[in-house]
Each structure stands twice: as C-alpha cells, then as structure tokens.
Amino acid sequence: MKQTLPALLRTLPLLFLSCSAGVLQAQVFSVSELRCEQSQRPLAVEPAGPRLSWQLNADRRGCLQSAYRILVADSPVALADDNGNVWDSGKVFSDQSVLVPYGGPALQSGKAYCWKVQAWDADGNVSPWSLPASLGTGLMSLQDWNGAKWIAMEPDVDSLKCIEGNTGEWKDGGPVFDKPVAPYKLPQLRREFTATKPVKRALAYICGLGQFEMFLNGEKVGDHFLDPAWTKFDKEAQYVAFDITGELRDGKNAVGVMLGNGYYHTPHGRYLKLLFSYGAPKMICKLQIEYADGTAQTVVSDDKWRASESPVTFSSIYGGEDYDASAVQPGWAEPGFDDRKWKNAVLTQGAGVKLIPQISEPLKVMERIPTVRRFRAANGNWVYDLGQNASGIVQLTVRAVTPQSIKLIPGELINDDSTVNQRSSGGPVFFSYTTRGDGSVESWQPQFTYYGFRYVEVEGAVPAGESNPGALPEVIDITGLHTRNSAAQVGTFACSDPLFDKIHSLIDWAVRSNMASVLTDCPHREKLGWLEVTHLMGGSIQYRYDISRLYAKQVNDMRTAQHADGMVPTIAPQYVTFSPDFIDTPEWG
C-alpha cells in the first residue's frame, strides 16, 4: 500500500494531460462566411483570378489557421462528392484567409461555379468542409455579349455633347453655362421573347446610362436604386447582373427597361451643380437562359427592341424628377402589349466605353421614415416633418378625381414662414407628380434622383380630412425613403451617456446619407466624390459598415481619374475640371 499510493499520485498528471488532450481534440472549429471578391454570392466577378475569403470559427481563444484547402467545381453534385473538378488547391500551408487568389485554370465567362473550404489549426486538427458557396463570372469582353448593341430612343446630338462639366460659377464675361445641352426625352424600351423549355438558370446582364430600372413580365427586377454606379462614362461603365430564373415564365415573356439621366446627362431647368452631357440615355442588355436539357438561348439589345417616351417627363440627379401618371401605358412591360405606336430603338455607339461588373454594393431603400407631424405654411401649402434629416426620396400616397399636378419640395430647413428652405442645399429642387385622377389610391416615388431632406412642402394638394374647397388631390401619406449604399452594418456603439449616444447617431446619419456609389460630400448640393472624405473617414466608417466593396470601387475611380502626369484629382469620378486651387490640393482630396 505504501508503494501503490505514490505510484497512483505519479500517474495523475499523466491522466490529466491525456484527458486535456482529448478535450482539445474535441473542441470545435469551422469555416464560414465564404466570400468571393468580398461578396457572398456574386453573379458577375471578373473571370481572371477572383479572390476568395472566409472566416475561422472556434469555441476557444487563440485558434489560428495553419493551412487550408479549396475546392472549386462546376456543379453542386461534384462539389458534394468533394470533387474539385475545376480546381483543387490541395493542402496549402498558410494562415491567409482574406482575398486568397484563385489558382486554377482560367474560368469561363458567364458561368456558375461553386466552392468550399476546409482549414487546419495550429495543432493540425482539420475542420469539416464549409457549406458550399457560389460565384458567377461576368462577361469578359464585348464578344461575350453575343452581339448585344447599345440602343436608345433617339440618337446622340454630337454637337451638344459636353464631356467636361461646368460648375455654373460666374466669371468675367458671363456665366460658364454657355453651351446648350440637348433636351433628350426619357425612354422606355421593350422586347418580347419565348422561353421554350424548362429553365435551369437565367441571368440578365445590363448597363443603362445614366440610370436604369429593368422589368420582367411587368415586375421590377431586383430592389436596387440608381443602378449602375457612377463612373467616368466616357472611359468606363459598370453593368449589373440579376438572377431572373424565378421570374421567367413558360412561353411568352417580356422585358422592359426605363432609363434616367443620372450623371450621364444633366438637363437645364432646375438647380444643378454641373452641366454636361455624354449623350442620349442608352442601354446594352443580354439575357442568358440555360435550359435543363443543356441548351441555351440569348436575348440581346438590338434595333428590334421597341421604344417610347416614358411617364418620367423630367429627371435630374440634382434638380428632381417629374412623373405623369396619366401617360402610363398599362402592361408595357408584359407580353401581349400592343406596341404598334412605338418605334424601333436606334443603334448608338456607347462612346466605346469599357464595360466591367458593378463593384460596390448597390444603393437600396434602407429605411422608411414616417411623418411625425404636419403643419401649414404662410403660403397655404402643407409641410410634412419626417423628424429625421436623411438622404433619399419621397413616397407619396394620394387620391384624386381628375388629373392634377402635385409638387413636393424637399429641404433640410424651414423658413420663418414655415415654407421649406433650400438655400444651403441647392434649389430649386422638387418632385412633381401628375395624378391619374380616376378616384383610386395612387402611390409614387422618384426613380432616378434623390436629395437630402427632413421636410416636404406639398403644393397642389391637401391632407386627407382637411378642408378642400378647391377639390385638390388628397394626400393620404407622405413617407421618406432613406436610400444609401447597402453596405452591411458590422459594428454598433452604445454607452451610458445619452449625449454621446446622440452624437453617435448624428454622425451615423451623416455618414450613411453620404454613402452612395461614391462617398459624397453632401446628398444634395454637390453629390461629388471628394477624396478627402474617402481618406479622412474611411478608418472610422469601417468600424460601422463593411465598406470593402465601396472602397474597391473608389480606388478604381481614382485609377480611372488619374492624369497622364500621375496626378489624382480631388474628385473621382472627375465630372468637372476645377481651377488649379481645387483640382490638386491635399485638404480637398
């Protein structure tokens, strides 16, 4: 017994170590959050060398990746069998898990791939395979567009193109707005086609300049706002990919596209910071349909598309937008619509721009801001207070018994007489809606512009339930739609001091209201990508939002804007050449 007890005590540490090792081996770690080019399920990445990222998860501290293995396959079935029939990286000894370059054979344009990852920790333990992720490659060259053409409703007026913008400042001898800009009408275009077999996968690739909205069988495709992202359109334009598999019908289908001006063409008539034009609104489009039997079909933009004026009668990225609901042609984006009064689209050049996939997250309606109070101004107009200053547009809900025009005047401030004040934000800016006037409830919101505002002054209508001797349209509701870049929120802040919380909220609203497809200086007066904002705010914003794709786009804008002598101007995209005091100065860019 004297010898047995010391022997038992000597074995206890060994037993403890053995049990500990078993516990360590039982501890779990896994791989998740797979991304390609910082996007979870991209539909159109550049086929040449996409970069892959993932996160390591563990139930203990200090778990580090020591190696990884990536499988890329051309079908979910192959990937489920652990068959990387496109690329098997093998076991790679590396702790890298962010933007790992794809190292397999060249990927094909316009194809779908799937991939997964497993990792090893520092102790040599291997994780399970991650859940599969998907990636789609974009269109690498114009040949991949299968003959798609740039089309428009009317040809460019080359003599009135004005590539370099003017700022509207007065100089000796008169204003610099001395060059007219063509009064292009805003088009809608349509095309019918037939899906002849069961569909496996269908994608739409589209670029509409300056902005576009796409419709399939009468419904808007996607939830994006102000597509595509702003670029220097004489050099580069970005196309957007949509998965339309679920929207296609067996048999007859119809695709429709509405075009807005955006930063492609800034018309006269209202407030504008810059005056320039790249030409008439235009678009290029390819629908790629893959059938279950392995065959394929493409529908491309050409002069067989039909074109007509849209109900959007005025649109300016600066000055606002007008819409005439009495001019709506019901069913125009549905199969069977009678378009005999329409005309064929015209072929146009598209200025020979380079087409690349959209880089940043799209803009979207990210929040609805209801009216908190309303009051009457001295001029008799009604003013709606949303209680929050934000970037976005107005959603109007109204009822009218005859076609009448309603003017919505947005602003951040109000005057002493309670009318909206636009002195510091740029004016005149307004949204105008002409009702159908059939007695039903109508709802409308601008499609191709936005502003920064808290108040909305309504001219030509009264709130429902108020005295209405003039039989004006009755406003049922005014709601603010906050639009911004849809970069995901990744951080939060809260503390015990209400003042700090309020300061954080104030700054956060300012940041998100200036997150467009560039980081703007303001959401109304200029809307330009001043690069000092990108530089000074980036380090802070990344703690609140995932701006990786937005900043990739901004860097691309800087590269495109760079001059031959190496100088990067203070704004990118460079829509205007400022004076020497502003074009190259560190405090502004």
Region roles according to the model:
Residues 1-30:
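Bacterial Sec-dependent N-terminal signal peptides
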Residues 25, 333, 581-589:
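Short, intrinsically disordered, charge-balanced linker/junction segments flanking boundaries
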Residues 29-112, 116-525, 532-533, 549-552, ...:
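Extracellular/oxidizing-compartment recognition motifs
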Residues 531-542, 548-552, 585-589:
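Well-ordered alpha-helical segments within folded domains of soluble proteins
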